[in-house]
């Protein structure tokens, strides 16, 4: 064997004996996938986050709605009070020649007649005979009457079959507020004179006191 053949054989041997480089093993498709419970946790987390956002939005809308409703109610109340106050300040006045006290108008009439005629005269003026509410109201009227010695009919009379004093509006007389002097019998009516409330015959001629409630109507000149 010559030298040329020997070199060729050596090259082939070297090529045959050259180590092979193995390619990296391929990974299975399941190797890169996350565990199943990770995916479930991610889904539930996203759902919970969305639900939380919706709850927050709903609460915000509810709070804004309640606040708006409260503001509207307050504004309506203020407007109503303002209107009522304006009406009271403008229209709540007694007619000319009538006295104003609390929520009533009073007038003392100087003509004399029976209790029935006095009540009828008050009715023609849109009023009634005096209904005394308490001692303070009685003191106000007594201070306003100049003729202390005269008697004035009030809206109180003795009724049958109740056998009791009653005001003309149907309420029962309260003896803790007023004390009535004099004889009481059928046909008795009450009058005030000085600081006393006296029982008299309803046919007696006395002066009288009328009263009417304050209202929202334009004051008139009742005579």
Curated annotation (Swiss-Prot):
One of its GO terms (cellular component) is external side of plasma membrane. It is found in: Membrane. A motif (ITIM motif) lies at residues 6-11. It is a single-pass type II membrane protein. Residues 1-43 are cytoplasmic. It comes from the Eukaryota. The chain crosses the membrane at residues 44-63. Changing residue 8 to F: Loss of PTPN6 binding and inhibition of Ca(2+) influx upon activation of natural killer cells. Expressed in NK cells and a subset of T-cells. Disulfide bonds join 122-210, 189-202. Gene3D superfamilies: Mannose-Binding Protein A, subunit A. One of its GO terms (molecular function) is signaling receptor activity. Residues 93-212 form the C-type lectin domain. The keyword ATP-binding does not apply. Changing residue 183 to V: In strain: BALB/c. Changing residue 32 to S: Loss of Klrb1b-mediated inhibition of natural killer cell cytotoxicity. Reduced LCK binding, loss of PTPN6 binding and loss of inhibition of Ca(2+) influx upon activation of natural killer cells. Residues 64-223 are extracellular. Homodimer; disulfide-linked. Interacts with tyrosine kinase LCK. Binds PTPN6/SHP-1 in a phosphorylation-dependent manner. Receptor for CLEC2D/OCIL. Ligand-binding contributes to inhibition of cytotoxic natural killer (NK) cells. May mediate MHC class I-independent 'missing-self' recognition of allografts, tumor cells and virus-infected cells. PANTHER family: KILLER CELL LECTIN-LIKE RECEPTOR SUBFAMILY B MEMBER 1. This is Killer cell lectin-like receptor subfamily B member 1B allele A. It comes from Mus musculus.
